[in-house]
């Protein structure tokens, strides 16, 4: 069973940067050693946003984007190696999630697509890469997501305390760690995605820092109720979603009925949408004693306050409080999933994704034969 230093690379639906984490991993523990966040050029970010919202590309443009993202991920890894004075030979493997550009796990031909050429990463770092983690689960009838609940269970489950882990990235997803029950997990709906899209269009800001805009506005209750009527929110688990569904076009369709509203009121309403949809799912799942929050949304003071208010009797905290950086959680999870793949261990949980069986995930791109 391979153990040693692994690197995890994650670029999520928020597109707020490439998260890179260095960790020592074996069958007994995961110890984070270092991390960095690598910027995504505005041109690349816009290209990804365009394809996620259905804009057509030529095959040449798509191929170029795949290559450019692969090179970006490699640059991020090499920056971390340089910072830590490490060589390629010091790393067992890289677990790279890739950039999701489409996720459609239901229908006649279910599929998910993450790009960022792993061959580019191998060629530019000299390190074996494990990637393409989601499609095996979909091939076995699963949603292909979320995959992180297995990692949450390995690190954060408690023998007696009812716990849930909430990741608020572009999409919010919940891991149910309930003693005596199979691990559960699913996407609750939009996390930061709609809030970020709105303030980007209205004020040219990548996100609402410290929820300043949202706190200056008032929740528009009719708009909130209109958005809450979306069928995704009442759909039973297993379920997963992404930017191809909850995007700026989705928001525009709901705003057509509310012309002339104050942009800050819309921002406040979107924050409330995220808080309400999460809290409703926590309660529908039986509630918990402790809700541990990670991802960019854990730094949104309004979201954290609203979750605490909507979940009385639940301790709402961040994963940082239990020693795991909320910013690095997902990248760390994919380093761990790479370790499991190389060890021949399953990485999915059928109780979460709905797959017909457990399976080893991903494809291996070896640096050396």
Swiss-Prot record:
Chain's role: Catalyzes the specific phosphorylation of 1,6-anhydro-N-acetylmuramic acid (anhMurNAc) with the simultaneous cleavage of the 1,6-anhydro ring, generating MurNAc-6-P. Is required for the utilization of anhMurNAc either imported from the medium or derived from its own cell wall murein, and thus plays a role in cell wall recycling.
Sorted keywords for this record are: ATP-binding, Carbohydrate metabolism, Kinase, Nucleotide-binding, Transferase
Q: Which Gene3D superfamilies match?
A: 3.30.420.40
Give its E.C. classification number.
2.7.1.170
Q: What class of enzyme is it?
A: transferase
Instruction: Report if keyword DNA-binding is assigned.
Output: no
Residue numbers binding ATP? 12-19
Question: Of which family is this protein a member?
Answer: Belongs to the anhydro-N-acetylmuramic acid kinase family.
Query: Pathway of this protein?
Result: Amino-sugar metabolism; 1,6-anhydro-N-acetylmuramate degradation; Cell wall biogenesis; peptidoglycan recycling
Query: MF terms per GO, please?
Result: ATP binding; kinase activity; phosphotransferase activity, alcohol group as acceptor
Name recorded for this polypeptide:
Anhydro-N-acetylmuramic acid kinase
Q: Which GO terms describe its biological process?
A: 1,6-anhydro-N-acetyl-beta-muramic acid catabolic process; amino sugar metabolic process; peptidoglycan turnover
What is the species of this protein? Escherichia coli (strain SMS-3-5 / SECEC)
The UniProt record lists the keyword Kinase: yes
